[in-house]
A protein has these predicted regions:
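Structured-RNA-binding interfaces characteristic of tRNA pseudouridine synthases
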Residues: 1-250
Length: 250
């Protein structure tokens, strides 16, 4: 029995999330159908994490076991012929027995994309949160620095979270602006349900001047976010990387 690790990129716009569900189109459903055809046997996959409806992935890790003998290089090419254009197997490699996309992961990095412009860009509607108000990125980064380290992130967990512990460690969190695009990168050893999108929403309020850095700090310390209305829109979020070794120290 072989254990295969895939890195998969996808545009989540047309899917009801990553996780397999009955009678609906999800990324995992489509991927398993293709892999089952390629391997000549029923394939059950495991992802490094769930992404919600409309969320994208630059590098989602997927593992599965198979008795099939198709070489990994051939698998990548063959998958391209069976999968829709919005799901791509970027790479495939054989891993030691016991390796698991989710349980072997040490950290993840997410990106969140904002576009700030007077006019909405119709070609980016599905790929960024578009705002017309200019943001104070310096203040947003001051607040983001408070996330670094190990904290109780209950303030940024949506109801429905199945994670048993709200204690997470954040290794990096920073906004970077280039023209009208403002990109948030955040890396940590784990994330609660809607945690990244809730953090983004709160930091954007700081950038708009509706909340202060001190307000953000108080909410984090108090482990509740009284002003949080809803998560930032799903379409701006990207699962960017999943790490299986210690987070690199810069």
């Amino acid at each position: 029995m072989r254990t295969i690790k895939l890195v998969v990129a996808y545009d989540g716009s047309a899917y009801l999330g990553f996780q397999k569900q009955k009678n609906v189109q999800t990324v995992q459903n489509v991927l398993e159908e293709a892999l089952t055809m390629l391997c000549g046997e029923k394939v059950v996959t495991a992802g490094s994490g769930r992404t919600d409806t409309g969320v994208h992935a630059l590098a989602q890790t997927v593992t599965f076991t198979t008795n099939g003998r198709i070489p990994c290089a051939n698998l990548v090419r063959a998958a391209a012929s069976l999968l829709p254009e919005d799901i791509v197997v970027v790479s495939a490699e054989e891993m030691p027995e016991g390796f698991h996309a989710r349980f072997s992961a040490r950290w993840k990095t997410y990106h969140y994309k904002l576009l700030v412009n007077e006019h909405v860009n119709p070609f980016m509607v599905r790929y960024a949160w578009q705002l017309r108000q200019q943001l104070e990125v310096k203040a947003m980064n001051e607040a983001a620095e408070l996330l670094l380290g190990t904290h109780d992130f209950s303030a940024f967990r949506s109801s429905g979270s199945v994670d048993t512990s709200p204690i997470k460690t954040i290794f990096a969190a920073k906004w970077q602006q280039q023209g009208e695009e403002i990109l948030f990168r955040i890396s940590g050893d784990g994330f609660l349900y809607h945690m990244v999108r809730n953090i983004v929403w709160s930091l954007v309020q700081v950038g708009m001047g509706k909340r202060t850095v001190q307000d953000f700090a108080a909410e984090l310390t108090a482990q509740r976010c009284e002003f949080l209305n809803e998560p930032a829109p799903a379409q701006g979020l990207y699962l960017a990387e999943v790490g299986y070794r210690e987070y690199p120290q810069l």
